[in-house]
Amino acid sequence: MSAPVNSMTTLINEKNAVANTTETGKASDTNASKVSSRRKFLGQVGTVLAGGAVFGKGVLASAQSSETTLEGIHVPRPTTDPRVRRCFAIRVGTANAEARIPVPPQTTNGDEGRYRDKCGTYTKGLLQAGIGLVNLHAFRTFKRALDSGNPADFENIIMGGSRRLNGPQGGLAFGLEGCDAVQLGNASCPDNQVYAVVVPPAPALASAAYGTELVELYWASLLRDVAFTDYVLNATAAEAAQELSAMPSYAGPRDNHGNVTPTLLFRGGYPGETIGPYISQLCVIPSFLGAQEMNQQMVTYAAGIDYMMDPATFQQVQNGIDTGLRNQLDPQPRYLNSGRGLGAYTHLDVLYQAYFTAYLVLNTIGVPVNPGNPYADSRTQNGFGTFGQPDFAATVAAIAGFALNCVWYHKWYVHLRHRPESGGAIVRQILTGHGRTLDGRVNDNVLNSMAVQRSFARYGDYFLSQAFPEGSPTHPAYPTGHGVVAGACITILKFFFDGDFVIPHPVVPSSDGLSLVPYTGGDAGQITVNGELNKIAHNISFGHGIHPGIHWRSDTDSSIQLGEALAISVLQDRARTYNERFTVNFTKIDGTTATISNQ
């Protein structure tokens, strides 16, 4: 992204913003029309802004009346006020820069086209035809709505019960900051300083990677009530680590010998995440919301109660029928010390709650601002509405909304990945002799796994147990909303705070979650703000995913990357709007440096 435009003349001579853009590839056939439509709109906007900006120059000189240049977009009547002219220049220049970003391929795993019965596709809430099977007429009404985007078509989707789909039209919303969702896909995005693939296709149903992720989910379901600090001595955790170590497609962190250890289970692999306790310091250190004390103890759910482990209940939930079951509360508030606790937290949290709380904790423990903050060394000023506390807090909240609509586009209009509960149902059908009712088959690595056998021994069936009576939310799995919000929000916090700051006096929840005790591990002096921000992103997204059984590991990993890319895009846009001159560097999730500058 270029630096802020310093004059209207510079801005309005930027021509052909989109005409010369080179695409990085084609969308998958399934999604080509949707991607093409969104690309066409962005192209029209870019062309109009480039050509219309030149037209606008003449308008400014001759004071002609406003002119419509695209449906809903007008070149305004000129004004002599320099601030309005400057504001207009910044807005048009920013839109020009965004419209130049190429549109990458939007590549799915191919399962929707591969299986006629749609057993590998998200269909929850639609009228079902059997375990793992959707009513195909209902599915066609669903796809008609997604393909048309017509609000009336969404009202004609054939549902199986009273539960409604969770906001599919949010994915069609446009934003006024940052690049568009369609500009982030199965390619890197150098314009947003992200050089890894942003949103690769999810693992396909029959792949070893899919099977490995499902094995991990079965183990997580069996460890839901075990304190993270107890994993090191827990026999089930040891079995889980041993089995996952032997799976080449396991994507989680390993030790220096290539092994998964009990203390590495269900962790992310970004820098700093394997240092210190499982739970981020930002989730447990007491803080203040103004004058309100926050001790970070949470209401959680009673241990040992899981759901959707019989065919009748499973099928009710897939149809969107209320089973009448409800989560039972643990009467004792606890610190986040187990998978069930994280699941309960993320079941009820406000969209950006964890990251706003993290912002409060960073202030409580005295983390300095990012050294690139223009007020870091000022003798006469401090930041406030810009580069100060109100800016910090408001930007964390704002980016969450942008991130959610971005990921909703990918969920509903590209990938339609089904939920782990559906994968567990396929395992169950195959292992109970009903596999021929389905077109798809999962990999033998999950069918023959110790995890599935241990789950059957506990529950008496092969379904993947769920921490919530309703199972997953009624939106597709990939990517995950909690993950993209995590990636976006931690990027904002890295932009504003000094990520290299070492967190003093780290703590860890006790085994029962009733108290905090000092963390005395040998790596206690290596726990940094950057590492704990990376860690909280996985804590919260896995807390909403792997631990309760409603998301896959790859949902989170891709989502955090997507959120980071979007946040960098928004920060680059906002850099144009600040009066202060600055250059801010921060460390991305891959360990490399991003730079936001308007100098």
Model features per residue range: what roles?
Residues R38, Q64-R553, D557-Q599:
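Hydrophobic alpha-helical bundle signature of multipass membrane enzymes
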Residues K40-S62:
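N-terminal export signals
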